């Protein structure tokens, strides 16, 4: 695999699809006028071949080639399991 692919740590918010999941990660953006840092959430669709992740898990994902119209990230592994 290419060494300059992006990897992220995200929280799983939905896994109701087959071989897919929706994850969300937060980033902080500085307001252009007031200078306050604002929390922004980004949702991504990921490819989970074996349906390993569950809602609430912290997972590692990697950018890849486009798999479908909305999926361009793939599941790497579970970092922390959900408490349920």
Swiss-Prot record:
A Gene Ontology term for the protein's cellular component: cytosolic small ribosomal subunit
Keyword Ion transport in record: no
PROSITE patterns to which the protein is assigned, alphabetical: RIBOSOMAL_S17
Keywords, sorted A to Z: Ribonucleoprotein, Ribosomal protein, RNA-binding, rRNA-binding
GO molecular function: rRNA binding; structural constituent of ribosome
S-S bonds: none
Function of the molecule: One of the primary rRNA binding proteins, it binds specifically to the 5'-end of 16S ribosomal RNA.
Classification via PANTHER family: 40S RIBOSOMAL PROTEIN S11 FAMILY MEMBER (PTHR10744), SMALL RIBOSOMAL SUBUNIT PROTEIN US17M (PTHR10744:SF1)
Family: Belongs to the universal ribosomal protein uS17 family.
Protein name: Small ribosomal subunit protein uS17
Species this chain originates from: Hamiltonella defensa subsp. Acyrthosiphon pisum (strain 5AT)
Gene symbol of the encoding locus: rpsQ
